[in-house]
């Protein structure tokens, strides 16, 4: 054998690298075992190994070839527990052919077999599942050799050679092994129907083709840097079939398959019935190989590894197989630091997204084909990211924002206030998220739902809608969402409003939910130490021009003040729900006009209810007509208001126009005033007169005036 050991310095360097790598995982000294021919290429491969089962196929030069030869290998029933220079071959029950020798070679006690093993430059190494266990614990000693992984010492410039393997071994012993096709390579596999063997032809690496996938990809960290951990579940025992069957076709996660898959021949893999029906005793293999670039522990960047966790047996579910990252590295990937960082972060995202959405995960890797595929990092970017990341983004417990450009987003845009636009889009996102999580994707466009159907959906929506973290909305937030949806319908011109009597049943559900939230302390009202305005404070507001009818803002602030004082409106919700028809201009028995809050719009759904006054506003000219509550309210309701907003069901508080010139008599937009702006009116008044703790001033902070008629008195 020594006469044939002619090799190049490069291959010798690779052997030394493997020996160093082997020394990091095993204390036994490897020695030369036997020689294998390389098929059509004719190059020899010397196999080095130790008694623990670690093996390395060392390529030799063409000078060792002594004529045409056929590949000869040992039987699968072999043992690595001997330190002898050769491997003991044990004939199997299925082989009766005598021992054949290499033509023109000395006999080395090699046995022919009907199944050959690949000895390409990707060196296969194998070891027992546990070093403290004997190999005899396996039912078949060939199961020990079936547990193989791809070494890294000859990965970078290797040529692939034909190999013959049992499909049962592939599916049973290597369900999750990621092949060297992750190196920017392409692999084609062919099926040889003769003797039910599968011949796998590996071609020189060019571009990344297809990749095996494994379930539950997640990111782990180790001593050598970040590592990609790919977890594969145990494969169930194959069933006996009467004819050739396809092994390893169970479907796995679809999203990751598109980015990481391996291509099989269309004919599939066939196996003999006798091979499939043979009893199987599965063990968990644990093999660790070091990278050829491995240096001292302090070196960083060359020691990144990919750990593949493949529980093959239920008895040892925690055993792992580790594969160095260099075995999965693209040519020239050392310069692509950004791509490596991306790959180190993406798998955990793919895993968390896919596992959470998949009710069950099969245990066989999905094998699919893709003829043209970009490099690995772009493939994962365009495939896994696009399919796994949902169409909306989230920040902690913030509600999702859908990244959809459509007409509904345009309907949310407000030319009056950016806060209104933000609140309307928020309401739209809440509705879309609720539809998607409740199997109602066809109803995400609220403008295309008929009124009757929308009323039914809203009945369920008000009761079941939650935040993205599963908690309930505050009562004020639920009100704002309802107003936002109604604003979208109005801008779309659908011809109905969700606050109308057509939606009475859904409105009833909303009130019930608001009552529950209020009882649970989730009304949304701020807990404040209420501070009251003094008479001098109010006088200062008049003198500073904060109150009056000089501008849209001052007139609106004055109306809010008088409604709070005279019409008994003390909460933000009462002001927000106020409609134009809820305040009526009436006359008393003395024929004196006055404004009264009758809530006539709210009473439409109440049959037989009598008119009740919650307060009255009369003419009061003791301090001049510029401070008369009746005159100022009249101006707001009948002079400076848009004519289209003088209907009974129009919102009472409108957004003030910002243009100081060319406003004419109309000072307000045809749009409801936002909650935030309405809530800030009173604190802003306190701020303008330089009072402390401005946020503690509310609608009840105004001085309560005496009324000619008590509250809740009947109107004539």
Swiss-Prot record:
UniProt superkingdom: Eukaryota
UniProt cross-references to InterPro entries, sorted A to Z: DUF3504 (IPR021893), KIAA1958 (IPR042838)
UniProt modified residues of type Phosphoserine: 97
Annotated TM spans: none
Pfam families: DUF3504
Keywords: Isopeptide bond, Phosphoprotein, Ubl conjugation
Region Disordered, residue ranges: 84-103, 153-189
The keyword Transmembrane helix belongs to this UniProt entry's keyword annotation: no
Cross-link (Glycyl lysine isopeptide (Lys-Gly) (interchain with G-Cter in SUMO2)): 201, 204, 237, 283, 626
Key word Oxidoreductase present: no
Protein name: Uncharacterized protein KIAA1958
Organism: Homo sapiens
Lineage of producing organism: Eukaryota, Metazoa, Chordata, Craniata, Vertebrata
Recorded name of the encoding gene: KIAA1958
């Amino acid at each position: 054998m020594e006469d044939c050991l002619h090799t190049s310095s490069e291959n010798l360097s690779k052997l030394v690298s493997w020996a160093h790598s082997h020394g990091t995982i095993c204390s036994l000294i490897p020695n030369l075992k036997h020689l294998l021919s390389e098929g059509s290429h004719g190059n020899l491969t010397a196999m080095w190994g130790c008694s623990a089962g670690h093996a390395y196929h060392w390529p030799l030069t063409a000078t060792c070839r002594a004529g045409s030869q056929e590949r000869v290998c040992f039987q699968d029933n072999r043992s690595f527990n001997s330190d002898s220079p050769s491997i003991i071959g044990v004939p199997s029950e299925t082989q009766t052919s005598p021992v054949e020798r290499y033509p023109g070679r000395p006999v080395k006690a090699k046995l022919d077999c009907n199944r050959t093993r690949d000895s390409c430059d990707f060196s296969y190494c194998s070891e027992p599942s546990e070093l403290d266990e004997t190999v005899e614990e396996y039912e078949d000693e060939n199961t020990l050799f079936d547990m193989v992984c791809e070494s890294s010492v000859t990965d970078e410039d290797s040529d692939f050679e034909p190999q013959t393997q049992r499909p049962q071994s592939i599916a049973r012993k290597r369900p999750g092994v990621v092949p060297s096709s992750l190196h920017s390579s392409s692999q084609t596999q062919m099926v040889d129907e003769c003797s039910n063997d599968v011949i796998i032809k590996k071609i020189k690496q060019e571009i990344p083709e297809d990749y095996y996938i494994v379930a539950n990809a997640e990111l782990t960290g180790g001593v050598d840097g970040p590592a990609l951990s790919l977890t594969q579940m145990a494969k169930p025992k194959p069933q006996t079939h009467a004819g050739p069957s396809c092994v390893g076709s169970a479907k796995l996660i679809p999203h990751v398959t598109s980015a990481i898959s391996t291509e099989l021949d269309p004919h599939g893999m066939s196996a003999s019935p006798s091979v499939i029906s043979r009893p199987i005793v599965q063990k968990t293999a644990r093999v660790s190989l070091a990278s050829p670039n491995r240096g001292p522990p302090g070196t960083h960047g060359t020691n990144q590894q990919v750990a593949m966790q493949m529980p093959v047996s239920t008895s040892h579910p925690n055993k792992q197989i580790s594969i160095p990252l260099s075995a999965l590295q693209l040519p020239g990937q050392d310069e692509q630091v950004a791509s490596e960082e991306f790959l180190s972060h993406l798998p955990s995202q793919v895993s968390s997204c896919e596992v959470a959405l998949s009710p069950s995960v099969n245990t066989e890797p999905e094998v699919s084909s893709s003829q043209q595929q970009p490099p690995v990092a772009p493939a994962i970017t365009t495939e896994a990211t696009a399919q796994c990341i949902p169409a909306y983004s989230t920040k902690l417990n913030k509600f999702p924002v859908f990244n959809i450009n459509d007409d509904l987003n345009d309907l949310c845009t407000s030319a009056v206030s950016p806060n209104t636009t933000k609140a309307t889009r928020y309401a739209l996102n809440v509705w879309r998220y609720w539809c998607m999580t409740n199997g109602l994707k066809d109803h995400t466009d609220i403008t295309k739902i008929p009124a009757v159907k929308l009323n039914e959906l809203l009945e369920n929506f008000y009761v079941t809608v939650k935040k993205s973290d599963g908690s309930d909305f505050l009562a004020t937030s639920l009100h704002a969402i309802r107003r936002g949806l109604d604003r979208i319908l109005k801008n779309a011109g659908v011809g109905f409003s969700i606050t109308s009597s057509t939606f009475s049943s859904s409105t009833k559900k909303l009130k019930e939910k608001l009552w529950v939230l209020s009882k649970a302390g989730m009304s949304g009202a701020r807990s404040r130490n209420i501070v009251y305005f003094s008479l001098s404070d109010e006088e200062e507001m008049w003198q500073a021009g904060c109150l009056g009818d000089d501008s849209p803002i001052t007139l609106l602030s004055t109306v809010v003040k008088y409604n709070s004082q005279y019409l008994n409106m003390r909460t933000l919700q009462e002001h927000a729900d106020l409609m134009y028809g809820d305040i009526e201009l009436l006359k008393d028995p003395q024929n004196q006009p006055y404004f009264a809050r009758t809530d006539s719009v709210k009473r439409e759904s109440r049959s037989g209810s009598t008119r009740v006054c919650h307060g009255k506003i009369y003419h009061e000219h003791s301090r001049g007509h510029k401070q008369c509550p009746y005159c100022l309210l009249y101006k707001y309701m009948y002079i400076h208001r848009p004519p289209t907003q003088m209907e009974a069901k129009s919102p009472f508080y409108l957004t003030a126009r910002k243009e100081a010139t060319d406003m004419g008599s109309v000072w307000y937009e045809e749009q409801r005033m936002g909650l935030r702006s309405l809530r800030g009116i009173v604190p802003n008044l306190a701020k303008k007169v330089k009072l402390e703790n401005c946020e503690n001033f509310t609608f009840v902070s105004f001085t309560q005036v005496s009324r000619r008629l008590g509250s809740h008195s009947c109107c004539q």
